[in-house]
Amino acid sequence: KNLRILSFLHGIYLSDASDNLIVGNELKDNLNSGVWLTYGSSFNVISGNRMFGNYYGIAFEWSSFNTVAQNEINGSTVGILVYSSSDNIIFKNRISFNINGIVCNVQSRRNIIQCNDIVSNSGFGVEIENSHDHRIIGNSIRDNWAGIYLHESYNNTIYHNNIMHNSPHQVYIYQSTCVWDDGYPSGGNYWSDYQGSDSYKGFGQNQFGSDGIGDTPYSIDIDDVDSFPLFAQITIFDVGVWNGVAYHIDIVTNSTVLDLCFNPNEGPLFRFNVTGDDGTNGFCRVAIPKTLLWVEDGWTITVGDQPVTDYLELEDESFTYLHFTYNHSIQTITIRGTRVIPEFPLVTLTLMILILATLTTIWKAKRKH
């Protein structure tokens, strides 16, 4: 923890080592890797480190069930290598100015690549080679030579990513199959070169009215399409953890969106700010977890001090989706439901009960004396 490790073969090396925490280190100019995990190293957490100029920023070799979160990795040949390793979580890292961003290869399986910023790598943003069953969700993959490269890989699922300005290839596919959307109304990915419109809604996009989903599929190659491309960039806001479940609210919008605030103590509502060029039209498509905030008789939506009555409400098993439009300026949007998740998580409530029980016992014991 909090070490500065420069110019070794490996900055930190774990072999058959589990349950370690690697946090807050600076790992620079190491010949092979900043962090190397091998031979069954598992259940390790690598978080909050800064890595620059290592050949591999972080490398997994035959190692599974590890978490890599909130690291900054740049100046490497490969930012994160997952070699014959499975069930790892790669979450909220910034991986930029490497040759390749994230590489999963040699029969790696079921790794989750989520909410990372994968930017300005001179090769591939994400490379999946001879590896299967990955979930690539909620990432910003932009300004790379190729955003995503798939080579002889199957059953990978890719949605809710912002795939932007990767040139010459947004995606490069060789003998691979994957799913490019999460169905309707959840949707697929935002593509910066999508040329379609949003005048229709519904699973078949054949009912008049906008829904934040492009009216026509995004064609990736002759065999692959994103059937429900998002019509603007998606922003994913973490709003808290209750009963061990992390909740997020997702907003697809052509506005700049900032400062989402959700506090159950304030009631069944949340608010966020939007900005855009005056005189233009803005829209939001907001995905709200059903177990976080819900209604009994309609949502109350205000933009500034103006109520929104003409909104579209859709739902699937887990989320409610609200789509509405407004005139651009600096605005605060408030969305109010009827009921909200309990203010105190179950774990916290149980702990409070135990503390109160203990204090009561102590108080009774003192009274006897």
Task: Show the residue positions of the predicted features.
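Short, threonine-centered small-residue motifs that mark membrane-proximal processing/anchoring sites
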Residues: 339-349
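Surface-exposed beta-strand/loop patches in extracellular or lumenal glycoproteins
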Residues: 172, 275-296
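C-terminal membrane-anchoring or membrane-association module
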Residues: 359-369
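Consensus "Asn ladder" position of solenoid repeat domains
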Residues: 2-3, 20, 25, 30, ...
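Acidic, glycine- and Ser/Thr-rich low-complexity intrinsically disordered tracts
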Residues: 109, 137, 154-245, 318, ...
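Glycine-rich beta-solenoid repeat tracts in large extracellular/virion proteins
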Residues: 10-16, 33-40, 56-62, 78-84, ...
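Carbohydrate-binding surface patches
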Residues: 252-285
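C-terminal beta-strand-rich structural cap/linker in extracellular carbohydrate-active enzymes
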Residues: 230-233, 315-340
